[in-house]
């Protein structure tokens, strides 16, 4: 498979915006359905963000704040608070592999390979 960042034929602003949205939605909902290529790229961003959040430092909090969308959870907590207070402590003893990708059947309209990515 080719380099996922080159597949979209879009500029870096578009790619970064899509990745920010997908990672934010993944952390908010715990699982999302997207194309296989996007899921593989989201996995890297999400895992690095969770690993940095485990450090619980001011620098990691600022890095996450610059990347995540300003979404609010059901408990009226921001996504940043959810990441540092709930998600990161859950993976404290886990050295990596915080996400799992399931391959789904191809999409009807254009036969694109689909996948479900979820937090373990």
From Swiss-Prot:
Highest taxon of the lineage: Bacteria
Cystine connections: none
Keywords of this entry: Ribonucleoprotein, Ribosomal protein
PROSITE patterns the UniProt entry points to: RIBOSOMAL_L17
Complex formation: Part of the 50S ribosomal subunit. Contacts protein L32.
GO cellular component: cytosolic large ribosomal subunit
An example Gene Ontology molecular-function term: structural constituent of ribosome
GO BP annotations, alphabetical order: translation
Ranges that cross the membrane: none
SUPFAM superfamilies: Prokaryotic ribosomal protein L17
Sequence similarity: Belongs to the bacterial ribosomal protein bL17 family.
Protein name as it appears in the record: Large ribosomal subunit protein bL17
